């Protein structure tokens, strides 16, 4: 049986996981560093890297024990090798490469964003292509996921990442770290229409987003208030979260149009034999019947010929830590339905940083014999579009 060991250390969570060729997660250990960073109100890179050093060995031992697996039984070792806080990325990558060298197992360098991008294939049996909204503490972008290593960024934030905005607003409101869950919790108790915040570049006509102006508006409001009591905090949290939902919803239609255009162009530019092989692959890729939401739909926003319709799915995937926000899940789900799509999101435990997604990305690359030399240099910045370069 094929077993892939995954290692994740790109930010403040130390994670190790083992999955099988059947996409079964045998073990998925995450050691959080929230306590170490809470006093600073954010992640301190030096502390994070040192914690990874002490946590990785412990996490590996726990995963091997829980999965009843020996290192000699591992087929390949996949590790996040960028993008992220470079100290932590180096620690995890070196740990993985040391194991690879010692046990003579293939090493697979994984782009952290690709891990998030492919999580829906691990959990929801989604074939390529699909539209992805990657929303996390470090990124916010719409991506056309065309195939393994084939990604087209349709639009992204031009300033702050969406998760960063959540964390910084939470800090302004004196809420605990990490801020995203705290904002969501407080928002349930507040009035989302109490304060009207700006929605930057909402009518730009493209898929780019901006959250810096929204964050500044919240800070300006807080500074103007005489008192920041619980009721006010709840209302600000609710109004902020509501505005985020409005921004994302307004961009979904732009993203769908761009996605459908990209899919159409992509398949028009490949030869006919490859088209037939891809159609066959999409039918036979998984042993079980594809989920209902992965089947081809006829309606689309972007008028195109019949070629693209053979490949176009009706799934919008949201991944990354912000995907765990249930309010945004509901808002975006309703928005997707308006345009004939269905929103797919991983279970909460796989929304935030984890090693199961890294192991799964490793599995796809293992199956395609895409291995990485041990002298690979970890990267602090690594775009999805540059993976195959």
From Swiss-Prot:
Substrate binds at residues 134-138, 167, 180, 325. Its EC number is 2.3.1.234. Keywords: Acyltransferase, Cytoplasm, Iron, Metal-binding, Transferase, tRNA processing. Binds 1 Fe(2+) ion per subunit. It comes from the Bacteria. It is an enzyme of class 2 (transferase). Fe cation binds at residues 112, 116, 353. GO terms for molecular function: iron ion binding; N(6)-L-threonylcarbamoyladenine synthase activity. InterPro entries: ATPase_NBD, Gcp-like_dom, KAE1/TsaD, Peptidase_M22_CS, RPE3, TsaD. It is found in: Cytoplasm. Its cofactor is Fe(2+). It catalyses: L-threonylcarbamoyladenylate + adenosine(37) in tRNA = N(6)-L-threonylcarbamoyladenosine(37) in tRNA + AMP + H(+). Pfam families: TsaD. Its main location: cytoplasm. CDD domains: ASKHA_NBD_TsaD_bac. The keyword Amino-acid biosynthesis does not apply. One of its GO terms (cellular component) is cytoplasm. Belongs to the KAE1 / TsaD family. Required for the formation of a threonylcarbamoyl group on adenosine at position 37 (t(6)A37) in tRNAs that read codons beginning with adenine. Is involved in the transfer of the threonylcarbamoyl moiety of threonylcarbamoyl-AMP (TC-AMP) to the N6 group of A37, together with TsaE and TsaB. TsaD likely plays a direct catalytic role in this reaction. PANTHER family: TRNA N6-ADENOSINE THREONYLCARBAMOYLTRANSFERASE, TRNA N6-ADENOSINE THREONYLCARBAMOYLTRANSFERASE, MITOCHONDRIAL. This is tRNA N6-adenosine threonylcarbamoyltransferase. It comes from Rickettsia felis (strain ATCC VR-1525 / URRWXCal2) (Rickettsia azadi). The lineage of its organism: Bacteria, Pseudomonadati, Pseudomonadota, Alphaproteobacteria, Rickettsiales.
